[in-house]
């Protein structure tokens, strides 16, 4: 329970008035619980979307659902997406890329990445004809994001500062990664049947390509690239689901 509370405090803005000593927790092994943080985020997103959808048109409800995640996470990973885009597409050397990612200012690449991310994300949601299914997507996709993050933890080389937040998860063993993937697959299977499982295969393929690209650019992961990977992973999952629903 302490591990889950610590993960909630780490990845969300939920005010839990509990002080936990990091020395008492093996966060690397406890990272298997990370998808359950996605469950909490997803439940919040689903609730906000569902309530707004009762009163407002569907596009407004979708925007509310997207904004709900920013509220509960503080835009933690959206900021990481912007920093990653600014750094990796800066056409600079490795050291300079890492410096750019640390910069609190958002550059042109970051703004473009965020704009296209939400435009594409919102368009994909609008492509789903069933309102109830959109609600389930708001619930499940944050779980997928945490599954992708766990995949990126596997045998991770850390490129950022050793004092960086992502370094806490350096050396995560394989078994928490596997457990996290099982949780994600169960969630996708329960809500979207075999199509959800097939869609996650596309997410895994994306994760492999993304990981290789990041390692080639900066030699490993850091907090920003980990957060960006999770954000893009849930976008890719939604894309694969919409594509499969259109084909089948």
UniProtKB/Swiss-Prot annotation:
Pathway stated in the Swiss-Prot or TrEMBL entry: Cofactor biosynthesis; adenosylcobalamin biosynthesis; adenosylcobalamin from cob(II)yrinate a,c-diamide: step 7/7
EC number, UniProt record: 2.7.8.26
Record's bilayer topology term: Multi-pass membrane protein
Co-factor(s): Mg(2+)
Enzyme superclass (EC): transferase
Subcellular locations according to the entry: Cell membrane
Keywords on record: Cell membrane, Cobalamin biosynthesis, Magnesium, Membrane, Transferase, Transmembrane, Transmembrane helix
Cystine residue pairs: none
Transmembrane segments: 24-44, 70-90, 106-126, 134-154, 157-177, 188-210, 228-248
Domain of life from the UniProt record: Bacteria
A GO CC term assigned to this protein in UniProt: plasma membrane
Catalytic activity line of the entry: alpha-ribazole + adenosylcob(III)inamide-GDP = adenosylcob(III)alamin + GMP + H(+); alpha-ribazole 5'-phosphate + adenosylcob(III)inamide-GDP = adenosylcob(III)alamin 5'-phosphate + GMP + H(+)
Keyword Transferase among record annotations: yes
Keyword flag Membrane: yes
GO molecular function term, any single one: cobalamin 5'-phosphate synthase activity
GO BP annotation list: cobalamin biosynthetic process
Family under the similarity heading: Belongs to the CobS family.
Function: Joins adenosylcobinamide-GDP and alpha-ribazole to generate adenosylcobalamin (Ado-cobalamin). Also synthesizes adenosylcobalamin 5'-phosphate from adenosylcobinamide-GDP and alpha-ribazole 5'-phosphate.
Name of the featured protein: Adenosylcobinamide-GDP ribazoletransferase
Native organism: Listeria monocytogenes serotype 4b (strain CLIP80459)
Gene: cobS
């Amino acid at each position: 329970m302490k591990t889950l509370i610590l993960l909630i405090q780490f990845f969300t803005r939920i005010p839990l008035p509990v002080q936990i000593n990091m020395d008492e927790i093996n966060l690397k092994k406890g990272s298997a619980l990370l998808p359950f943080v996605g469950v909490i985020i997803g439940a919040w997103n689903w609730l906000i979307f569902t309530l707004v959808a009762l009163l407002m048109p569907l596009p407004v409800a979708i925007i509310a659902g997207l904004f709900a995640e920013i509220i509960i996470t503080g835009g933690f990973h959206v900021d990481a997406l912007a920093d990653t885009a600014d750094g990796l597409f800066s056409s600079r050397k490795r050291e300079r890329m890492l410096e750019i990612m640390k910069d609190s200012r958002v550059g042109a690449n970051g703004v473009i990445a965020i704009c296209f991310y939400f435009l594409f994300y919102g368009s994909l949601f609008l492509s789903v004809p069933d309102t109830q299914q959109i609600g389930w997507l708001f619930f499940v996709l944050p779980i997928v994001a945490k599954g992708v993050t766990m995949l990126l933890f596997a045998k991770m080389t850390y490129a950022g500062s050793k004092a960086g937040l992502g370094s806490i998860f350096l050396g995560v063993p394989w078994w928490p990664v596997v457990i996290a993937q099982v949780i994600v697959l169960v969630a996708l299977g329960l809500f979207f049947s075999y199509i959800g499982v097939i869609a996650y295969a596309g997410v895994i393929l994306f994760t492999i390509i993304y990981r290789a690209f990041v390692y080639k650019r900066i030699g490993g992961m850091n907090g920003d690239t980990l957060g960006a990977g999770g954000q893009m992973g849930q976008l890719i999952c939604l894309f694969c689901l919409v594509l499969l629903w259109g084909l089948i």
